[in-house]
Regions:
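Membrane-proximal helix-turn-helix segments that form the acceptor-binding/catalytic region
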Residues: 146-166
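Carbohydrate-associated surface elements
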Residues: 172, 194
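Conserved donor-binding/catalytic core segment of Leloir-type glycosyltransferases
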Residues: 207-232, 238-242, 252
Length: 400
């Protein structure tokens, strides 16, 4: 018996790592895969001049971050997330006007659904999250600053309660949601982000080991990738690199979209700006690296740690939020506290010193990511969830 075709609309914010998920959806559901026909909206694509102007106005900062030691007193986060939701609603209406019909809506992440609450209550909907507002609130430096996120917290709660299914990238995010919204009975499925494994060759692991053990005077290459250099712990890493004199026996490649102050650079450090994800240069940096480090202060999940694992690299990360769900401390990498310079120096020295340990940790990291984030398995699980949600209520309807 032929399985009925389920029409799904994916709405993606198109910012930062969300573009990677959009690329996955585009590839995974080309045509009709697993009984699902997919249409996708990426909000950063096809913006009109008027939409760009509106975004600039709505998302403009009225309170400079750091004034009086606080941020977000102008409710910048809520305005930006509402703008994403408004644009998503507009794009959905445009599809509706062309006669589009969908069985299921999939919003990635929750901000894209902010202006679609009524639609969620009438159309089976999946909300994909990697965190609640706790990520922002735990960085607040005062009670007043924490309260500025209250509108986001309330809107998130309304969305979560109305959805048919919530897909969380981690156990940590799922637990946060249950803790913060105890009255929310919506089912939560834990599904780590899929990783495009075909971009990372498993033979790199032995290739690195051979390079390190057969090259006289070999200097291991340490790789950092983080767009917001300061928030991702870039300056903490540079301080540790300098204080530990690590440049004497290793090199450090910094890949970032932020300017890096030259006065913090020391021996062995190279800065790479403007490297596009999945480009040949990006792939070469992963291949040539011997270990990965990101001593981040603010990370909900850390897709880049998944990419490091896919590349067969041991990773040094921080013991925050869902990062320990990706890095098995002592097995596939090492975890330190944010801002802890001496532990970071020790972790770097441990991995720089041993090609055998790097190889073994990298192999375990690769095995873990193949098991937990294989794109084919994710596609099958997501397709099954879409069909289950679609069949839990009435059949397809025109979006309203």
């Amino acid at each position: 018996m032929t399985r009925p075709l389920t029409h799904a609309l994916f709405v993606n914010s198109g910012i930062l790592g969300q573009r990677t998920f959009a690329r996955f959806i585009q590839n995974a559901f080309t045509g009709q895969q697993e009984g699902v026909r997919a249409t996708q909206i990426v909000l950063t694509e096809g913006l009109t001049p008027a939409e760009r102007v509106l975004r600039r106005v709505v998302c403009s900062r009225l309170w400079r971050d750091g004034w009086a030691g606080m941020t977000n007193l102008d409710f910048m986060r809520y305005r930006a997330e509402w703008n994403a939701g408004w644009l998503a609603r507009k794009r959905i209406r445009q599809l509706e006007q062309s006669g589009a019909r969908f069985d299921v809506l999939h919003f990635h992440r929750q901000a894209t659904s902010y202006a679609s609450l009524r639609r969620i209550r009438t159309t089976p909907t999946i909300i994909s999250i990697d965190c609640t507002q706790r990520c922002a609130m735990q960085s607040a430096r005062s009670r007043l600053e924490a309260r500025t996120y209250a509108p986001n917290v309330r809107r998130d709660g309304d969305i979560f309660r109305a959805a048919q299914l919530i897909i969380s990238t981690s156990r940590w995010a799922a637990d946060c949601l249950r803790d913060e919204y105890p009255d929310c009975t919506t089912e939560i499925a834990i599904m780590p982000n899929p990783v495009q494994l075909d971009g990372f060759d498993p033979t790199w692991i032995e290739e690195r080991y051979a390079r390190a053990t057969e090259t006289p005077g070999y200097r291991p290459r340490v790789l950092f990738m983080g767009g917001d250099f300061r928030r991702k712990g870039g300056y903490d890493l540079l301080a540790a690199w300098r204080d530990g004199q690590l440049g004497q026996h290793a090199s450090l490649d910094l890949v970032t979209s932020s300017p890096v102050e030259s006065r913090f650079l020391s021996a062995g450090v190279a800065v790479h700006v403007g490297v596009a994800a999945h480009s040949p240069e990006w792939r070469a940096l992963w291949r040539d690296a011997d270990l990965f480090v990101l001593p981040t202060w603010d990370e909900a999940f850390g897709m880049v740690f998944q990419e490091a694992a896919a590349a067969g690299l041991p990773a040094i990360g921080t013991r925050i939020n869902a990062v320990p769900e990706v890095i098995n401390d002592g097995q596939s990498g090492l975890l330190v506290a944010p801002g802890a310079s001496e532990p970071l120096i020790r972790a770097l020295n441990q991995l720089i010193a041993s090609a055998e340990r790097r190889r073994d940790m990298g192999a375990r990291a690769r095995d873990f990511i193949v098991q937990s984030a294989h794109p084919d398995a994710y596609r099958r699980t997501l397709a099954a969830a879409i069909q289950r949600v679609a069949n839990s209520t009435q059949p397809a309807r025109t979006i309203r």
